[in-house]
Structures are given as structure tokens and as C-alpha cells.
């Protein structure tokens, strides 16, 4: 599990196709990398990946085709920056909201207006979004400001823009989206109840 509070930025330093998947290497600070060991979970732009190897400043992962199909990781290239968060340990504080690192899909930035970012996603995504509700964008825990049929927006404080990759994003770029799991469970449960009663 993760908290949605980005601990460090990383830079893609290795990117190589492996069958239908890929091998991904990321360079970061020794402060972030040193505590990690092979087998640890790390959220890379919000995607939970398992560490396959590491050294003093680099961490490596294998990314399977299913992950590439529903995230932006396959679009990364060497020198691209990514958000990093190590998995929570017992007793760690949760500064954002609980995340699994299982990305629901992607959304496109279609408008940036000062500190307000507007995104376009699928209608399937929108059914789980509510104003003032939680959302994770590239692994960052954020609060939804507005929600329409297939668009939504968030407001970003200067600290978030400075410490994450969102401050460098441009209109037209895609981001990874994880919806709040408790909200998804409630919505899906209500839909099943309505469907079984013939009221859907």
C-alpha cells in the first residue's frame, strides 16, 4: 500500500523491450534507494512495481504487458522524470489516502489554467469520481474540485507542482489514474443491487 505522498523524483535511465513487456531502470537519490531491497514494492508514477535489482542510485523493474496496456509506463523514455514512493511500512503515517498502486486507466490533460489542471477520461472512470473525493494522479493523492460526464479537475498547490512531475506536464499529455477503492466498492455494490432488483 502507498499514501500518495511522493517521496522523490526519479529519472528513467534504462528502457529495454523484453518480449511483450519491458525492463525499466530509474536513477534516484541514495536517500531513496539505499533502504530498498530486491522484492520491495515501489510506486512509479502511481504504478506498483516489484524491484528486481538495485545499486546505490538505481532501481530496476520488469513491467508486464498488462501493466503497459493500462498505464503510461510504455511511453517513457530515458531522461523522463517519474514520481516515486516506497511502499508503506507498519507505523508509517498516511499523509494522503491509501493507494494500492493498481492503476484504473489513464486520462489526458486538456487544459492547464494556473494551478488548476483539467483532465479528460472515460465515462467508465467518471462514475467513480465525486467532487471533494479522492483521486491519485501519477501516484499523487489529490482532491477532486469538479467532475463532469467525462472530465474532471484538481487544484494544485505550489509545493505539489515543485515536488512532483505534474508541474512539468503539458496539455495533451496522459497521466495514470487510480480511483479511491472504497468509492469503487460502494458504487459497484449499489449497481449490483439495482441490477438484481431490476431498477438499473
From Swiss-Prot:
Top-rank lineage group of the source organism: Bacteria
Keywords, sorted A to Z: Repeat, Riboflavin biosynthesis, Transferase
Enzyme class per UniProt: transferase
Keyword ATP-binding: no
EC number: 2.5.1.9
Lumazine-binding repeat extents: 1-97, 98-190
Keyword Electron transport appears in the UniProt entry: no
CDD domains in the cross-refs: Riboflavin_synthase_like
Disulfide bonds: none
GO molecular function: riboflavin synthase activity
SUPFAM superfamilies per UniProt: Riboflavin synthase domain-like
Positions that bind 2,4-dihydroxypteridine 2: 48-50, 62-67, 101-103, 132
One BP annotation, GO: riboflavin biosynthetic process
Subunit structure: Homotrimer.
Protein function: Catalyzes the dismutation of two molecules of 6,7-dimethyl-8-ribityllumazine, resulting in the formation of riboflavin and 5-amino-6-(D-ribitylamino)uracil.
Protein name: Riboflavin synthase
Protein source organism: Chlamydia pneumoniae
Phylogenetic lineage: Bacteria, Pseudomonadati, Chlamydiota, Chlamydiia, Chlamydiales
Amino acid at each position: 500500500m502507498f499514501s500518495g505522498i511522493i517521496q522523490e523524483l526519479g529519472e528513467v535511465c534504462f528502457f529495454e523491450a523484453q518480449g511483450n513487456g519491458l525492463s525499466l531502470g530509474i536513477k534516484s537519490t541514495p536517500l531513496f534507494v539505499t533502504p530498498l531491497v530486491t522484492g520491495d514494492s515501489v510506486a512509479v508514477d502511481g504504478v506498483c512495481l516489484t524491484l528486481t535489482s538495485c545499486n546505490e542510485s538505481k532501481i530496476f523493474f520488469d513491467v508486464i504487458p498488462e501493466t503497459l496496456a493500462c498505464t503510461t509506463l510504455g511511453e517513457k523514455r530515458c531522461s523522463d522524470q517519474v514520481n516515486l514512493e516506497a511502499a508503506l511500512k507498519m507505523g508509517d503515517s498516511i499523509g494522503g489516502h491509501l493507494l494500492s498502486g493498481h492503476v484504473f486507466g489513464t486520462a489526458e490533460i486538456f487544459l492547464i489554467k494556473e494551478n488548476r489542471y483539467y483532465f479528460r477520461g472515460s465515462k467508465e472512470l467518471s462514475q467513480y469520481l465525486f467532487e471533494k473525493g479522492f483521486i491519485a494522479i501519477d501516484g499523487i493523492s489529490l482532491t477532486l474540485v469538479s467532475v463532469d460526464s467525462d472530465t474532471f479537475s484538481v487544484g494544485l498547490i505550489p509545493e505539489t507542482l515543485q515536488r512532483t512531475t505534474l508541474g512539468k506536464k503539458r496539455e495533451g499529455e496522459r497521466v495514470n489514474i487510480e480511483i479511491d477503492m472504497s468509492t469503487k466498492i460502494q458504487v459497484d455494490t449499489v449497481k449490483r443491487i439495482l441490477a438484481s432488483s431490476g431498477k438499473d
